[in-house]
UniProtKB/Swiss-Prot annotation:
A Gene Ontology term for the protein's cellular component: cytosolic small ribosomal subunit
Gene, per the UniProt record: rpsQ
Family membership: Belongs to the universal ribosomal protein uS17 family.
Gene Ontology MF terms: rRNA binding; structural constituent of ribosome
Origin species: Acidovorax ebreus (strain TPSY) (Diaphorobacter sp. (strain TPSY))
Subunit annotation: Part of the 30S ribosomal subunit.
Keywords on record: Ribonucleoprotein, Ribosomal protein, RNA-binding, rRNA-binding
CDD domains membership: Ribosomal_uS17
InterPro entries for the chain: NA-bd_OB-fold (IPR012340), Ribosomal_uS17 (IPR000266), Ribosomal_uS17_bact/chlr (IPR019984), Ribosomal_uS17_CS (IPR019979)
Protein name per Swiss-Prot or TrEMBL: Small ribosomal subunit protein uS17
GO terms of biological process kind: translation
Role: One of the primary rRNA binding proteins, it binds specifically to the 5'-end of 16S ribosomal RNA.
Length: 89
């Protein structure tokens, strides 16, 4: 009975909006929700601080973050992988 355990940690995908702090990136995660009365699709967003040990993620990159133990007062997420590199303007 060697079954692979499913990870209980949440993963989210978002866009890096700030990389000014050492070893930390701020990630904006957007989600779509339907209004319960008016049935309109709304976009809600949340910002998360994620740990970036090597400073490899830059502003505009789309990355995946995974829930972890508290690393500081506001940092409970770790940047795990790059989904899409930021394009040139």
């Amino acid at each position: 009975m060697t079954e692979a355990k499913k990870s209980l940690k949440r993963t989210l995908v978002g866009k890096v909006v700030s990389d000014k702090r050492a070893k930390t990136v701020t990630v904006l995660v957007e989600r779509r929700v339907k209004h319960p009365i008016y049935d309109k699709i709304m976009i809600k967003s949340s910002k998360y601080h994620a740990h970036d040990e090597n400073g490899e993620y830059k502003m505009g990159d789309t990355i995946e973050i995974t829930e972890s133990r508290p690393l500081s007062k506001t940092k409970n997420w770790v940047a795990t992988r790059l989904v899409q590199k930021a394009g040139l303007l």
